A protein has these predicted regions:
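Polar, enzyme-active/binding microenvironments
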Residues: 1-175
Length: 175
């Protein structure tokens, strides 16, 4: 599932990979509710969570450009749900469904972590090394966060409560 992004301008478009065709193909899905780039996601093609991001369409003083928005994908449509506690973009996400996820790091090199339980975000223990443009994988209770800006090789393991520094990447990079 591919959703949102900077084209430019930012898009709310959704595309699904169709494995029912011999070589596979992308098909258009329902658009998200807010066009934004630099957002994060977690889940599968039928149970996805999209959160955070940046939307130039919103500008002060009416609305901030960095978004706290969260949307859930059920395999057919996006539904707006509760916002993150801290609006940010350039963050990473981890999790295997739209009911259990992590929002990790993000703009201004923050180390914030939030957990999603299917209806609300909760503040959790921060990364040891604050950063943005990082990558992550895993579940909401066992995740790995790595790389990021400012061009770090740091890797950290999440156990559902705390982040622990583990062996670094051989080469620091940003996503």
């Amino acid at each position: 599932l591919a959703f949102g992004g900077e084209t430019p301008p930012n898009t709310a478009a959704t595309e699904e990979w169709n494995v029912g065709v011999a070589l596979g193909a992308w098909v258009t899905g329902a658009n998200g509710n807010t066009a934004r780039g630099n957002l994060a996601g977690a889940g599968t093609s039928t149970s996805t969570l999209a959160f955070g991001g940046f939307s130039p369409a919103f500008a002060p003083p009416n609305d901030d450009r960095v978004r706290p928005d969260t949307e859930q994908w059920n395999g057919s449509v996006w539904a707006v749900t509760n916002d993150m506690n801290t609006a940010r973009n350039n963050l990473a996400g981890a999790g295997v469904s739209n009911t259990s996820a992590l929002a990790i790091g993000g703009d201004d090199n923050d180390g914030y972590t939030e957990t999603w339980d299917g209806s609300t975000w909760a503040e959790a223990n921060d990364l040891n090394t604050a950063r943005e443009f990082l990558a992550a994988c895993g579940t909401a209770t066992a995740a790995l966060a790595f790389g990021g800006e400012p061009n770090v090789a740091d890797a950290e393991l999440w156990n559902g409560t705390n982040w622990t520094e583990v062996n670094n990447l051989n080469t620091g990079r940003v996503k």
